[in-house]
């Protein structure tokens, strides 16, 4: 069972147990509180398959965070529009009634102007000190051993991502391997306070058996076994540690946002692991207010596409199963469906496919033909991330609530 099954159970949990709540968008939600999802990265890259996901948008937003960027122009230029509504709402609130010299702009016109007018984009495309600013340039009161001088602003800032990488390389057993986006002193300057507000990484040493397996020597015995072990032990290119990532999220738009968040933090884990030569091990999400917007409920049901047990029963082919069906006790929907699950009878018209893989290209050649390694801090481009063997069901459209 991988994280997609956890996700589908979460949708079902909200539909069955969610309480109605009002929210800042005025849409209304059904909500549960305090859930956790987990995924072992060796089961595949956790990009949902029960609906088609926008891979390029996931990569683009994460690189936007890692650049320390807070202006949507980078996103818009790369056809990623998940923050359009927040920027447009900010524009509407902060412009006068006539929108100054711009006239009345529809959201589509606003986004086109962001794309084509650099001066306009600089003024109205910025979302305030959101994720990227906090990850890469958290303002501190003065100079300390963690801070650097930001020449653009003149402030002393802390580059949390750079510090995290340095700590992973020098003190991987630290319990302070954290990055935080919840800067209380700057929340009122943000167009939208962070929903996923922080993450922590954890590392452990790999066993000799795990390193042998990574090197392709699993199960090797005989005369040369000790020599192979010594070779693997001395080979520093074979990772010596596994790394896991856990993120915390206060507000979870379960239908649209959470699938993005899962894939984004999984990709971040892959990038960091590659940077510090560790093996991505486990991804964990701690989720607070876990909700479905009321205008996403039908879409969630479509994604689940649960098949009633009476239809599932007709898929039985083994004569002994057909005979024993009537002896299920207690004869309740829950027990019947569990019995059918054990016999691998499809429970949904959108059964999950095997998860894909992600390949990261961190090698490059400079203008002088000299090879170099790209860094999580500044080097990656959208084209450096290749999604392999991704098979999915059709997309399910739903409105973005701002």
Model-derived regions, located:
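Terminal, non-catalytic protein-protein interaction segments that mediate quaternary/complex assembly
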Residues: 1-402
């Amino acid at each position: 069972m991988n994280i997609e099954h956890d996700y589908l159970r979460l949708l079902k949990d909200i539909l069955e147990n969610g309480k109605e709540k009002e929210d800042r968008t005025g849409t209304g939600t059904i909500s549960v509180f305090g859930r956790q999802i987990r995924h072992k990265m060796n089961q595949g890259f956790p990009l949902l398959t029960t609906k088609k996901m926008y891979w390029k948008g996931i990569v683009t937003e994460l690189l936007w965070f890692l650049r320390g960027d807070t202006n949507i122009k980078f996103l818009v230029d790369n056809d990623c529009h998940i923050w359009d509504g927040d920027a447009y709402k900010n524009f509407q609130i902060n412009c006068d009634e006539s929108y100054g010299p711009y006239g009345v702009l529809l959201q589509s016109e606003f986004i086109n102007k962001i794309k084509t007018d650099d001066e306009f984009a600089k003024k109205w495309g910025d979302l305030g000190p959101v994720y990227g600013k906090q990850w890469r340039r958290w303002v501190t009161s003065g100079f300390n051993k963690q801070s650097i001088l930001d020449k653009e602003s003149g402030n002393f800032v802390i580059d949390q991502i750079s510090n995290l990488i340095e700590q992973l390389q020098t003190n991987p057993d630290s319990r302070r391997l954290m990055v935080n986006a919840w800067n209380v002193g700057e929340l009122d300057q943000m167009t939208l306070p962070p929903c996923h507000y922080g993450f922590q990484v954890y590392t452990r040493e790999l066993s000799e058996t795990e390193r042998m397996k990574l090197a392709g020597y699993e199960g090797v015995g005989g005369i040369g076994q000790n020599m192979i072990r010594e070779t693997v032990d001395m080979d520093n290119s074979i990772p010596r540690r596994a790394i896991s990532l856990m993120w915390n999220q206060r507000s979870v738009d379960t239908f649209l946002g959470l699938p993005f968040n899962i894939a984004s933090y999984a990709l971040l884990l892959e990038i960091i692991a590659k940077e510090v030569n560790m093996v991505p091990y486990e991804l964990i999400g701690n989720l607070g207010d876990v909700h479905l917007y009321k205008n996403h409920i039908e879409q969630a049901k479509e994604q689940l596409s649960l098949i009633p047990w009476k239809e599932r029963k007709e898929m039985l082919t083994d004569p002994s199963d057909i005979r024993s069906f009537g002896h299920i006790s207690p004869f309740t929907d829950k027990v019947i469906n569990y019995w059918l699950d054990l016999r691998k009878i499809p429970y949904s018209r959108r059964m999950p496919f095997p998860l894909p893989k992600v390949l990261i290209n961190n090698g490059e050649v400079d203008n002088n033909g000299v090879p170099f390694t790209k860094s999580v801090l500044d080097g990656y481009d959208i084209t450096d991330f290749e999604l392999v063997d991704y098979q999915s069901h059709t997309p399910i459209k739903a409105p973005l609530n701002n």
